[in-house]
Amino acid sequence: MFNVRQLIATTLLLSCAFAAQAERLKDIASISGVRSNQLIGYGLVVGLNGTGDQTTQTPFTLQTFNNMLSQFGIKVPAGSGNVQLKNVAAVSVHADLPPFAKPGQVVDITVSSIGNSKSLRGGSLLMTPLKGIDGNVYAIAQGNLVVGGFDAQGRDGSKITVNVPSAGRIPGGASVERAVPSGFNQGNTLTLNLNRPDFTTAKRIVDKVNDLLGPGVAQAVHGGSVRVSAPMDPSQRVDYLSILENLEIDPGQAVAKVIINSRTGTIVIGQNVKVSPAVTHGSLTVTITEDPIVSQPGAFSNGQTAVVPRSRVNAEQEAKPMFKFGPGTTLDEIVRAVNQVGAAPGNLMAILEALKHRPLQADLIVI
């Protein structure tokens, strides 16, 4: 049914006519079932320079340490539960197991302190099994940590901390022990899931694949998925997908969005965001000053000294210019106009909040 050589020749001919704005199919969609899996584990980091957990406050660290020693035939004497270990820290370990990972391959891991360790710098992670959501062990982690931050403290109590010393990474620190079953080679169809569901993009993918391979090869399931017929032979399926994923697709225009972060003042504006005719915004500053006074009773009186609150409330309306825009004005033009008069990001966010109720022709997302 599928001739790989003919597909390659046809793809090369069609690629010359693709627009410069087009994107590869692999950049806008993923194959259903081809995904990474999260792994997590719990272990110990040893060899710390006195920056480990205070085990009197984190009993689980000491319990884990004792369990590890018991596996080597070492029994901790009774009554030593309050021993202080300064060079050991309990940590969580997590990693992403990439698709098609096989036993013997290595993956990067992230190690994070879960106790009160001050720093993991200089530590080594002991053998830690990494489990999936199904409870099976898929990898074994061990190795020396690479920590980007550090912590220093003087005798007078002054201290300095750079970045985050309580977390680190081990490149290639986990060895894969079990492969995750994949349904990639099952069935005679494959499903392409769009990273950003869009009906226009889904239709253009269907049209592009059918123009290349023939009618009915690709069918849109909905705005987020496209189902394509595929060879049954695994090697042909790989060649087939290598051609499909390099097809140039012109994606549909995304929905106009404005994203604002009220905590940081960050504003992200999408393309072609337009507003209706007029906008005006003023700046009102309300100042409340607390100036309590002390009421002192006279001598030999039965009165008591009391604090009497006294507040002054002052409202100031700054003389800000009125902004007026014509129909079809883009939000980018509004931002430039607001910035020219020296308005703060908070004023711009207030304008965007007001525009949300009617004139703003876009989705306003506040994070």
Swiss-Prot record:
PANTHER family: FLAGELLAR P-RING PERIPLASMIC PROTEIN FLGI, FLAGELLAR P-RING PROTEIN. Keywords: Bacterial flagellum, Periplasm, Signal. It is found in: Periplasm; Bacterial flagellum basal body. The keyword Signal applies. It holds the Pfam family FlgI. Assembles around the rod to form the L-ring and probably protects the motor/basal body from shearing forces during rotation. InterPro entries: Flag_FlgI. Belongs to the FlgI family. Residues 1-22 form the signal peptide. The basal body constitutes a major portion of the flagellar organelle and consists of four rings (L,P,S, and M) mounted on a central rod. This is Flagellar P-ring protein. GO terms for molecular function: structural molecule activity. GO terms for biological process: bacterial-type flagellum-dependent cell motility. It comes from Pseudomonas putida. One of its GO terms (cellular component) is bacterial-type flagellum basal body, distal rod, P ring.
